[in-house]
Each structure stands twice: as C-alpha cells, then as structure tokens.
Amino acid sequence: MTIYEGRRTIDGLVVTADGKRLDEHYEIKRFTRFGFEWTYEGESPQQLALAILFDRLADKERAIQLSEPFMKTDIANLDNDWKLTSEEIDAFVRGNPQAE
C-alpha cells in the first residue's frame, strides 16, 4: 500500500509517496507552472491529482481523464496536512464512471 502525504512547511509544500518526493509529471500534462496545491479547485490542485493518479495507475490517459474529477472530489477537500492511501485512490477510480 502506497501512502501519499502532503504538508505545508516553512520552506513550502512537500508531497511524498512512501516518503519519496512526488514528481509533478509535467511531461504528461502541464496544468500549471507553479507546482502542487490543494484545499481548493484549480490548476495546481489538478496537477497534484494528475501526479497521484499517474503514480498509482501508471496510465497517462486515465490519469489525465480522471484528474479533474479527482481534484474536485478529493484534492480540493484536503486539509493543510493530509494523507491518502492507495486504497482510497483505488476506491475513487472504481467509483468514477469516467474511469472505464
């Protein structure tokens, strides 16, 4: 099980997957040039959604397709410091009609 974590520090935002820095995956799709964000709907939160989904699914097209709904239902509602498990992400994918 992969654990994704985000926190706000004095040095900025930190997002990890099992303790390793999560890449923005701009090579797949660039929604923003400002990196990750969360707690609201927008381009930087969608970049985070894309990065998490691609890390979990290893499927560029599905990650792009699901990034907006995942951002709206999950990423926009995260607290300043948060944790998501791969099981929670899998549940989102299973429950999303666009995932097929």
How would you label these PLM feature ranges?
Residues 58-96:
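Short, compact, well-ordered microdomains
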Residues 11-69:
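Amphipathic alpha-helical packing elements
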Residues 1-15:
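Glycine-rich short-loop/terminal segments
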Residues 1, 94-100:
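Short intrinsically disordered terminal tails
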